[in-house]
C-alpha cells in the first residue's frame, strides 16, 4: 500500500492512497451542489475547495458543462444566444411572443440537457443505497462537488426570464414541468453576492455573450432566494395546507411578487409565507389571465414543485467581501453538517470514470 495521505489528482478527482487501495465495501458520500447566479464565484469556490487539504478523503468535482453549452449544439453558443435574445427583448426590438417559444424556452431546455443527463447518472450510482445523517468526515469519505444543480436551468433561470419579460407564462410552465425528480439528501450551497459586485465581475471577466442587464440580474438573484424560501416553507407546511393557501393567492399576489423581485433585494426568510415563495407565480384566481384556463395544469406543477423542493437542503452562503478561500472553507463547514449517502466502492469507481469523461467532454 502507498503511503497514507499521499494525494493523486486526475480530471476533477482527488483521492488519498488509502482510498485507492482499501478494499472495504462501502463509502459515505456527501453530494454538494454549488449554485447561484452567474458571476457570484461558485466555480472559483469549488475549484479552490478541491485544492484545500481540510477534507480528509476523496474529492470529486463535476464541472459546469460550459463546452457543451457553447460548442455542442450545431456549433451554436447557447449562452451567447440566450443573452442576445434577452437584450433584444429588453430593448423592445423583439416581442415576447417572438422570443419565447422558438428561442428562450428552446435554448433553456437545451441548456438543461447536460445537467439533467449527469444528474441521472449520479443517482444511478448513489441514489439506491442507504442514507446517513451528518457525521464528521473521515479518510474513507467522498466529497462530491457539482457545479450547478439541474434546478438552475429548469427553475431559477426560467423564473427570472419570466419575471423580466423574456419568457411567456405557458413556456415557463413547460420548463417547470421538466424538473427532474431529486432524491432525498440533496445538498445545495446557494452563493449570493451584492448585485453591483456581481455586475463588476461579469464585466471584468468578459465572457462572450454575457451582458449586464440590471433587471434580469435582480430577478435571477431573487429567484434563487425564493427557491430557498420555498424549500423552507415546504418543510414547515403540510401538503393540504399548501393547497389551501395556494387557492387563496390572487393576481394581486403575483403582481406584488413580480414587483418585489424586480426592484428589491429579497432575503432568505426564517419562516416564509407562501407569497414569499415561488408558488406566488402560480396564482389560480380568475383575475389572473392564466390561472383559470390552466388551473388543472398548474395544480400538477404545484404538486411537482412541492414533491421535488421539499427534499432539498439549501445552505446559504453570502459571499460579500469573502475570498475564494473563505467561501471554500464555508462549503467545507456545510459539508460536515450535510446529510450523506453510502454507496458501494465499485459504484464510486464507476462514478469517478463518469466524472472524468463528462469533464473532458463538457466541462469548462
From Swiss-Prot:
Residues at which substrate binds? 108, 207
Which EC class does it fall in? transferase
From what superkingdom does this record's organism come? Viruses
- Which residues hold ATP? 36-43, 201
GO molecular function, one example? ATP binding
Q: Which Pfam families match?
A: Herpes_TK
Task: Decide whether keyword ATP-binding is in the record.
Answer: yes
Q: Which UniProt keywords apply?
A: ATP-binding, DNA synthesis, Early protein, Kinase, Nucleotide-binding, Transferase
Keyword presence, Amino-acid biosynthesis? no
GO aspect biological process, one term: DNA biosynthetic process
Enzymatic reactions: thymidine + ATP = dTMP + ADP + H(+)
Q: What's the name of the protein?
A: Thymidine kinase
What's the source species for this entry?
Answer: Infectious laryngotracheitis virus (strain Thorne V882) (ILTV)
The uppermost taxa in this organism's lineage are:
Viruses, Duplodnaviria, Heunggongvirae, Peploviricota, Herviviricetes
Gene that produces this protein = TK
Amino acid at each position: 500500500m502507498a503511503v497514507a495521505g499521499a494525494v493523486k489528482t486526475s480530471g476533477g478527482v482527488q483521492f488519498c492512497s488509502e482510498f485507492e487501495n482499501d478494499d472495504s465495501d462501502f463509502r459515505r458520500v456527501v453530494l454538494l451542489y454549488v449554485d447561484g447566479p452567474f458571476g457570484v464565484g461558485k466555480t472559483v469556490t469549488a475549484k479552490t475547495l478541491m485544492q484545500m487539504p481540510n477534507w480528509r478523503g476523496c474529492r470529486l468535482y463535476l464541472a459546469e458543462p460550459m463546452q457543451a453549452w457553447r460548442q455542442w449544439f450545431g456549433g451554436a453558443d447557447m449562452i451567447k444566444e440566450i443573452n442576445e435574445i434577452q437584450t433584444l427583448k429588453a430593448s423592445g426590438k423583439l416581442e415576447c411572443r417572438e422570443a419565447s417559444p422558438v428561442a428562450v424556452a428552446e435554448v433553456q431546455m437545451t441548456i438543461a440537457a447536460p445537467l439533467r443527463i449527469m444528474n441521472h447518472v449520479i443517482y444511478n450510482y448513489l441514489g439506491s443505497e442507504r442514507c446517513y445523517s451528518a457525521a464528521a468526515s473521515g479518510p474513507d469519505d467522498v466529497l462530491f462537488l457539482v457545479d450547478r444543480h439541474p434546478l438552475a436551468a429548469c427553475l431559477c433561470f426560467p423564473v427570472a426570464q419570466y419575471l423580466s419579460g423574456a419568457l411567456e407564462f405557458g413556456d415557463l410552465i413547460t420548463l417547470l414541468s421538466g424538473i427532474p425528480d431529486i432524491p432525498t439528501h440533496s445538498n445545495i450551497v446557494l452563493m449570493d453576492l451584492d448585485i453591483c459586485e456581481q455586475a463588476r465581475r461579469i464585466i471584468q471577466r468578459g465572457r462572450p455573450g454575457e451582458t449586464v442587464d440590471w433587471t434580469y440580474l435582480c430577478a435571477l438573484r431573487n429567484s434563487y432566494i425564493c427557491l430557498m424560501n420555498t424549500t423552507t416553507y415546504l418543510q414547515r407546511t403540510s401538503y393540504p395546507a399548501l393547497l389551501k393557501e395556494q387557492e387563496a393567492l390572487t393576481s394581486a399576489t403575483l403582481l406584488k411578487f413580480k414587483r418585489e423581485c424586480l426592484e428589491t433585494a429579497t432575503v432568505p426568510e426564517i419562516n416564509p409565507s407562501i407569497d414569499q415563495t415561488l408558488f406566488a407565480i402560480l396564482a389560480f384566481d380568475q383575475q389572473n389571465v392564466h390561472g383559470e384556463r390552466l388551473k388543472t395544469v398548474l395544480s400538477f406543477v404545484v404538486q411537482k414543485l412541492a414533491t421535488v423542493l421539499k427534499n432539498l437542503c439549501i445552505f446559504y452562503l453570502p459571499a460579500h467581501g469573502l475570498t475564494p478561500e473563505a467561501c471554500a472553507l464555508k462549503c467545507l463547514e456545510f459539508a460536515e453538517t450535510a446529510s450523506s449517502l453510502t454507496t458501494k466502492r465499485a459504484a464510486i469507481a464507476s462514478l469517478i470514470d463518469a466524472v472524468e469523461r463528462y469533464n473532458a467532454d463538457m466541462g469548462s
